[in-house]
């Protein structure tokens, strides 16, 4: 999976880590695309950067995205507001790998204050190199979520009283 286009968005808390990840991705043969912040501003707000990165990722099939902030939590939530986005909070190599393999996540959120640069880069590498498994059981679940996103009708709860 070399040569991936990877859209990145970060607020001030993820700004420096984003710069490190961009350089790492370039050195690894990928094409990082910076969606901001473009300078360090302690008063910036993460939603614009994360929504932009997620919007561009969803609009570019086959691409991936990474959103960064202090914890990655709010950034992941913001990215998931974009219709069609599947953004997982990746706090380990295993969660990054499973996000791709089981959930076909196009984006991950990483906490810039939660990891060393070396740890974050191993998480990024796991994410960009792990393929989607295409397993039917995982696809069914993704389809259920996509249908809910489209219709806003919750799926029936198995075993629930009608």
From Swiss-Prot:
Coiled coil: none annotated. Homodimer. This is Ribose-5-phosphate isomerase B. The keyword Manganese does not apply. Its EC number is 5.3.1.6. The gene is rpiB. The active site is at residues 75, 102. GO terms for molecular function: ribose-5-phosphate isomerase activity. It is an enzyme of class 5 (isomerase). Keywords: Carbohydrate metabolism, Isomerase. D-ribulose 5-phosphate binds at residues 11-12, 70-74, 103, 113, 137, 141. It catalyses: aldehydo-D-ribose 5-phosphate = D-ribulose 5-phosphate.
